[in-house]
Amino acid sequence: RINVLITACGAPGIKGTIFAIKNNPDLVDTHVVGVDVDEKAVGQYLVERFYRVPAPEDPKYINVLLDICCKEKVDVVIPQATRELSAVSKNIDFFKENGIAVMVSPYESIMLANDKLKILELFANLGLPYPNYQLVSSIDELRNAVIAFGYPERPVVVKPPVSNGMRGLRILRDGAWDVYRFLSEKPSGVEVTLEELITILEKGDFFPQLIVSEYLPGKEYSVDAFVGKHIKFAIPRVRNKIVNGISFSNEIELREDMIRYTLEASQEIGLRYCFGFQYKLDEHGLPKVLECNPRVQGTMVASVFTGANVIWCGVREALGEPLNEPPNIKSSVEFHRTWGGIGVVDGKAEEI
């Protein structure tokens, strides 16, 4: 039996991560421990044991996590949240000294991968496609850059170099909302006008560094990837429907260009185990990089249905049981989310 600890078990992808571990191709029995900063985290009803932990920024976080690992005889830790990666990757050796593997890339690789600006610079240096961009540090620089990218005739993207999920992302579009859209569409909170964004940014005592980039009108892709001692592979999927940053409808599309970009960039960064990259097509159908997620992605469970369980590959690699042959990846695969829930009566949980 393998004892697995998953962090951030209140994250939207928790059920998928557990599914990938429980439905591993080696038929290994697994015992899953979950931790989260939120005592109400929904994942507590999906794991065998649950613990509340301090925030990753808390100096006590690592020691609390280690104590839980020792108590539960944990074999491997799987970090799920971006904000935890820094603290956990800094302490890989600390866990290793206590006989615990951590499925995370080295600290330096994590710091590079989590920085969207550094990813853009990396792709530029490697000669791989990336959106045209400009770094701005003031209102005047923001206004000039946005206009240079074609606003208001063209939409423009603004985002901070380091953020989690869709935090800080805005698409600048002239007349972003009118009465017709107001009455017919649900608000997304992403689209604003330039003046609306400036109004927000003026309500503070500092101006954050921001990336202004061209808007890519085509399909968005997420690539689930694995890099181990002997093998590496990548599985692109089209994100046909995205709700609040979460993939609800996915279709596997094994595009060789995105596979090559992902594996080439990940080698340069020094990524290990499982991780993801996101791309979007420009007006000519060329995939350009958006960001890297150096961790388990929220919909990485889709890979299970291709015959290439990316998460389990990472677990085996972390435990010193590397795969020697690449899996046979099926291409005619879709993955769709549906709303579900958990009812809790007198402490007993039942899924619907």
State where each predicted segment sits.
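ATP-binding N-terminal substructure of ATP-dependent carboxylate-amine bond-forming enzymes
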Residues: 1-104
